[in-house]
Amino acid sequence: MQSKFWFEFLQTLPTLPGDTVPVMAIQASPGETSGELIIAQAPNQTLDNNNSALGGLSPLLFFPVVIIAVIFLILVTIFLYTRFYVIAPNNEALVRTGGVFKKEQMVILHGGCIVIPGFHEITRVSLREISIDVVRAGNLAVRTQDYMRANMRVTFYVCITPNRNEILTAAARLSKKGQISEADIKDALEKRADDAIRAAAKKKKLAELDSDKLGFADEVLNLIQGDLRKVGLTLNNIAISEIEESDTYDENNFFDAQGVRLRTETIQRSIQQKREVELTTRVAIEQGELEAEKKSLAIKREQEDANITQQKEIELLKLAQRKELESQEAQQQREIQEAKDKEEAKKERNKILQEQAVEEERIQKELAIQNSQIASAIALEERNKELKVAQALQKQEAEVAEIQRKKTIEASQLQAKAEIALAEQKTQITEQTAAIAIANKQKERLEAEALRAEAESGVITAQEVEAAERAQKLAVIVAQQDAQQHRIAEQNVVEIDVFRRRRQAESARQAAELEAESIRTLADANRHKAMAEAEGQKAIIEAHNSLSNANRTAELLKTIWPELVTQLPDLIKALAPQPGVLGESRIYSFPGLSGSNGNGSNSGDINKLLLSTSGLTLLNGLLNEGKLSTVVDQVKSLLQDPPSVSPPSAAVSEDDWPDLAPPTETNFSPEEI
């Protein structure tokens, strides 16, 4: 920029004729970044014409160049000064090591020095005073001479003395990375301080440490000062801010155990002394208070006696006056009250008489209404009971008649089927021999007698059962009616007596009792109805059971009929009289008795049935009367044809059912088969 300025300045100067201006080359200053070479060349003609003029102006060009060079040198000097010259602050010292030609250490205080990178190294040493707290508490508590453990905070005030030797020692012992920091000083001090504190504490008891903090601080100072000077540090002062007893004792440690014992003894002794002082003080205070209280009470008692005496006199006067006034007022009040009482008694008596009259009239009306309601309810209940009893009897009679009708119809059906079976069998038997016809007649007679006996026994049984049931039901109904009438009569008597005795206070409860009694009466009627229905159901079940017996008999005949049909010819032949046999000896032989004829087990069952006592009796009767074929035909027709309803007149008459003959001795012989 300066070269351009001078170049433009030269161009503005006037040209001299006849002089030649040489070519000038101006190189850019070191500050120019372009490094551009500026060449100023005047026109040949102009330079030649003005050559002499420039020769006269050369001193003017020399001074600016000199000024520029001087300014440039000043700037370079300032730059080098600020770059390589280091000044020590007021609270720091500089230690320069190294050199260009000679290696040496230099301590700079309140000044500066040249530091050339690569040749010199600077260490900054702070001269400020530093406070370092060393805390020993908890598990790190200090043990004293009496084996007690103490928590304490000790503050050390250290610095580096502005002395060449101490500065060089501190720089050599404590510096890191070209400086000495507070952390470096604390690291150098803490362990030395710990040893000094513990050593000084072992020389004093806990109480002495607390009472003589300055002596303890001097002891620590004397112990640590020599070690700190070896590293270039100077200990200015020690401050002990607090000393407290620690509670971190280990009872398994010998020293701690001694301390705990001493601590306990001291504490307990102090507590005892404190308690003694407190008791002594309290006794003295209480004695003084007692004396003062006695004097105060004596004075108060005298005052109270005087006051009481005066109050008694005043009260006696007031009492006399009050009694006189009260007697007068009482007399007046008594007279007024007597008049009021008489008037009130008169009004109350009239009111009571009116209320009694109204209440008696109301009670009479309610009694009449309740009596009529009770009578109506009783009459209605009796009609309902009679109606229910009549309905129950009608229902039972209808059920019994239905059962009897069913029994009669079923018996008629059985008899009709038996007659049809006998008629069909009779047409087959007539083709047999005369001996077989005689046997058939005897069998028919026996069959008729058996059927008649069975029918008679069935009719008698049914009539007896029906008569017993009817008598039982009638007895139950009569008993129910008698009990109901008796209960209603007793109830009426009780209710009338209750209504007469309890007038006003129990009218509501009487109505409730009557309602409950009505409910109980209905419940009794329902219960008796249920009993009557149960008895009727029982009769129906028994009738059904008798019908079931007849049905079971028919099922049995239906089961054995196929076997009986196949063996019927052999049976008739076996039952026929054999020539050469005397008397009425009959030999019955039934094929398959032992179950070996290939017909299975049914043959054995038939033989067992017919060989029983009743079977032999029936068989003998049928043989004597010759009605076996008739019975067989009827049974066959009954089992083959469906049941049909027939009138009772279609049954076999009683003449066809002769009495059964007594059983005769029967001998079985294999030759008669």
Curated annotation (Swiss-Prot):
Family indicated by similarity: Belongs to the band 7/mec-2 family. Flotillin subfamily.
Signal peptide segment: none
Membrane topology of the entry: Single-pass membrane protein
Task of the protein: Found in functional membrane microdomains (FMM) that may be equivalent to eukaryotic membrane rafts. FMMs are highly dynamic and increase in number as cells age. Flotillins are thought to be important factors in membrane fluidity.
InterPro entries: Band_7, Band_7/SPFH_dom_sf, Flotillin_C, Flotillin_fam
Transmembrane recorded as keyword: yes
Known partners and oligomeric status: Homooligomerizes.
Cell compartment(s), UniProt: Cell inner membrane; Membrane raft
Protein's recorded name: Flotillin family inner membrane protein sll1021
Polar residues compositional bias, start-end: 664-673
Primary location: membrane
Any GO CC annotation of this UniProt entry: plasma membrane
Disulfide bonds: none
UniProt entry tagged with the keyword Cell inner membrane: yes
Residue ranges, annotated region (Disordered): 639-673
Keywords assigned by UniProt, alphabetized: Cell inner membrane, Cell membrane, Membrane, Transmembrane, Transmembrane helix
Transmembrane segments: 60-80
Gene3D superfamilies the record matches: Band 7 domain
Top-level lineage group: Bacteria
